[in-house]
Amino acid sequence: MRFNDSQDSTPERERRLVRVLPRRLAVCREPLAGEVCISITNPRQSQAELEDGYADILRLGFHDTDQVGGNFTVMSREHAKAVLEFGAKHKDAPLMVHCDAGASRSVGVGLFLAAWLNRPLRLVATDVLEPNPWVVNQLRGAALSRAFAARDWRLLSCALFGSKEKLAKRIPD
């Protein structure tokens, strides 16, 4: 599986990529025409000041944790539903997902969306696929009801069999 290989950079592939970046790179990146963004920050952190030009931005605030407790805000089912709605709305648009490090929360969101939408994934900050398990599980839960309502069998497959390994196998090179 190639998640950070940039050798195949045809314009068609570049437009289909789901890019996962750390915040420091996301804020200085100029978006492609029609590109959309999912921006993930900690709840009380300032929003990322992204370059102008994104067709749409979904801003979410939750901590990079995989368990409820303490003073942490975990990804909620509502967050997950918003991600799926955004993905469905912009299924053909270039997509960039970022969080602080670009290595856990955004990897979970990017991996799930790439598998569901049958798009290649590019990880910029890491070559290790370690998505936040809570994030993936919230997306799987939200995907179940959406998949039945929309009769989206690919989404249902991601929801039912959405382990990190199985999601990764669904992503085209």
Can you annotate each of these PLM segments?
Residues L32, E78, A82, S104-G108:
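Short, well-structured alpha-helical interface segments that form or flank functional binding sites
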Residues L58-M96, L129:
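Helix-loop module immediately N-terminal to the HCX5R catalytic loop
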Residues E51-Y54, G110-A114:
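Short, glycine/charged-enriched secondary-structure capping and boundary segments
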Residues A88-P94, L111-D173:
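PTP/DSP superfamily signal
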Residues M1-E14, F161, K166-D173:
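Short, low-complexity, intrinsically disordered N-terminal peptides in bacterial proteins
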Residues R2-L60:
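Glycine-rich, flexible N-terminal cofactor/catalytic loop recognition
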Residues S46-Q47, V68, S104-G108:
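Short catalytic/ligand-binding loop motif for oxyanion handling, primarily in non-cytosolic enzymes
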Residues L95-F112:
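A phosphate-binding catalytic loop at a beta-strand-loop-alpha-helix junction
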